[in-house]
């Protein structure tokens, strides 16, 4: 295999060709930095967190594929992944995970000790998550914690503390993550049942749409509370209204529980997060 072919395999293993996960991680992280800074965050901190999100999302994908390497070949959506298809060895994948993990850790070493301490917890959570699908019916709830961990880290980096406002934002993102990752799990539900993978899509059963709606409502409530604690105004409120519109659209998409529309609903959350982040930023800059 040529160097170019090997690089392509590494890029696909790290999902660099599919940025949706990176974006879903990025928006709440940037919102946390903006809230914490009371406007535009420190440029150095901003750059470190953007790079860190990209690298840690890649790490998460690698360790996820390593954990699922014997199962992915039985799932339609994942059977072509590099580890499942045999394009890359388990040792190579773990080596790449280690290198990227060390690089991510080197980034936080440029920040304060509290961020470093929180980052260690974040790495541990990232490693544990893929294995929760074997032992619990609620891996999406664990993922909510993993994908929200950048929020207290962002506050710690910007202010040196993690105030109550940060935990409301954490709760908002946790609920939102459970909602959209359950939509994602609905795509694989039939295959997951065959191979023994657990998910909230399976756990919720015929009440999946209603429970997703409840998590969306909880996320919105927490986003509103975080905004109120930060003294946000009308533009942020418009972002909240847009977020509601996206949630309603997603509910319409998942109504029939078909794979294609459920996946489209999952992808639509990128736009919901982006619009809310832009609204928050404009609210600080204009008002």
Curated annotation (Swiss-Prot):
Q: For this UniProt entry, what's an example GO CC term?
A: plasma membrane
Example GO molecular function: 4-hydroxybenzoate polyprenyltransferase activity
List cofactor names only: Mg(2+)
Q: Which reaction does it catalyse?
A: all-trans-octaprenyl diphosphate + 4-hydroxybenzoate = 4-hydroxy-3-(all-trans-octaprenyl)benzoate + diphosphate
Broad class of enzyme this protein falls into? transferase
User: TM spans, by residue?
Assistant: 35-55, 96-116, 211-231, 235-255, 262-282
The cellular location(s) given in this protein's UniProt record come to: Cell inner membrane
Q: Does the keyword Transferase apply?
A: yes
Q: What is its main location?
A: membrane
The answer to whether keyword Cell inner membrane applies is yes
The Swiss-Prot or TrEMBL record describes its family as follows:
Belongs to the UbiA prenyltransferase family.
Function, in words: Catalyzes the prenylation of para-hydroxybenzoate (PHB) with an all-trans polyprenyl group. Mediates the second step in the final reaction sequence of ubiquinone-8 (UQ-8) biosynthesis, which is the condensation of the polyisoprenoid side chain with PHB, generating the first membrane-bound Q intermediate 3-octaprenyl-4-hydroxybenzoate.
**Record protein name field:** 4-hydroxybenzoate octaprenyltransferase
């Amino acid at each position: 295999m040529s160097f170019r072919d090997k690089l392509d395999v590494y890029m696909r293993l790290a999902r660099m060709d599919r940025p949706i996960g990176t974006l879903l991680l990025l928006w709440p992280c940037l919102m946390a930095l903006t809230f914490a800074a009371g406007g535009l965050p420190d440029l150095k901190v901003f750059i470190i967190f953007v790079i860190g999100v990209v690298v840690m999302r890649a790490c998460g994908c690698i360790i996820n594929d390593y954990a699922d390497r014997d199962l992915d070949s039985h799932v339609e959506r994942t059977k072509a992944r590099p580890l499942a298809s045999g394009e890359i060895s388990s040792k190579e994948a773990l080596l790449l995970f280690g290198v990227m993990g060390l690089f991510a850790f080197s980034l936080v070493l440029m920040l304060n000790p509290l961020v470093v301490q929180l980052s260690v917890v974040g790495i541990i959570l990232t490693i544990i998550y893929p294995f929760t699908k074997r032992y619990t019916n609620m891996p999406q709830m664990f993922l909510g914690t993993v994908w929200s961990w950048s929020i207290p880290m962002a506050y710690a980096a910007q202010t040196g503390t993690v105030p109550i406002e940060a935990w409301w934002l954490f709760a908002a993102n946790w609920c939102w993550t459970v909602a959209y990752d359950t939509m994602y799990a609905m795509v694989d539900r039939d295959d997951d049942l065959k191979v023994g993978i657990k998910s909230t899509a399976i756990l919720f059963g015929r009440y999946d749409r209603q429970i997703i709606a409840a998590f969306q409502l909880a996320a919105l409530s927490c986003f509103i509370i975080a905004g109120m604690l930060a003294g946000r105004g009308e533009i942020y409120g418009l972002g909240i209204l847009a977020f509601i519109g996206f949630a309603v659209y997603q509910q319409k998409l998942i109504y029939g529980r078909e794979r294609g529309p459920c996946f489209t609903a999952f992808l639509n959350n990128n736009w919901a997060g982006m619009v809310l982040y832009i609204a928050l930023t404009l609210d600080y800059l204009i008002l």
